[in-house]
């Protein structure tokens, strides 16, 4: 287990690598969050590509993509087939990909699709407590895409899911937990206002893809995602304590986020 100092150094290293290399993140994501997702990737220093067509996704992956995001938020059968194709090509090219199983357990099509995708070697799985519990095979109660369980409730399921899939699992909530099934890192950055803006959680999936493109391990990428997004959320609320302006300030905060901010603000919970 890394010390807090080592974790902070790793997070700042990932931030620096994103800004230095500007990885291309191919996002097969939901229609509700595409603008925020694309702008968030640009703000942190990555390059977004938003596609839904299978043929074009394969072309993009072959052109130098750093990571792939698969987000099931508004999935259709056609898009689901494109996701399967993109995932197979990403695996063939050894490109890391992230699964964001939005509202899995609440709706049948995406639950079936997520069950298939989790067996195809995602590097990171990001979800709220209910989504992670459902994907791991546990019963959970949701309100659409929103979780009614705490992230701590899902920690056991997250560890099992990580061991089963080989992915790092990031459970987001008041406390964010990142695990590879053996190690667990808990981070306590963020603000409740983040849950009042549509797309912030889904955009964390995109950020985790950017981190996966540069980080030495999926677990470290998950930790970096939680810390960077959480700190940006805190900074955004200090500037804009209402939902509409908060969304804009979140992008500004990610753009302005410095290594010094990470050193000063990162909070890790002892387990």
UniProtKB/Swiss-Prot annotation:
ATP binds at residues 126, 172. It catalyses: 5-(2-hydroxyethyl)-4-methylthiazole + ATP = 4-methyl-5-(2-phosphooxyethyl)-thiazole + ADP + H(+). The keyword Transferase applies. GO terms for molecular function: ATP binding; hydroxyethylthiazole kinase activity; magnesium ion binding. Keywords: ATP-binding, Kinase, Magnesium, Metal-binding, Nucleotide-binding, Thiamine biosynthesis, Transferase. Its EC number is 2.7.1.50. One of its GO terms (biological process) is thiamine biosynthetic process. Gene3D superfamilies: 3.40.1190.20. It comes from the Bacteria. Substrate binds at residues 50, 199. InterPro entries: Hyethyz_kinase, Ribokinase-like. Belongs to the Thz kinase family. Catalyzes the phosphorylation of the hydroxyl group of 4-methyl-5-beta-hydroxyethylthiazole (THZ). NCBIfam families: PRK09355.1 (NF006830). This is Hydroxyethylthiazole kinase. The gene is thiM.
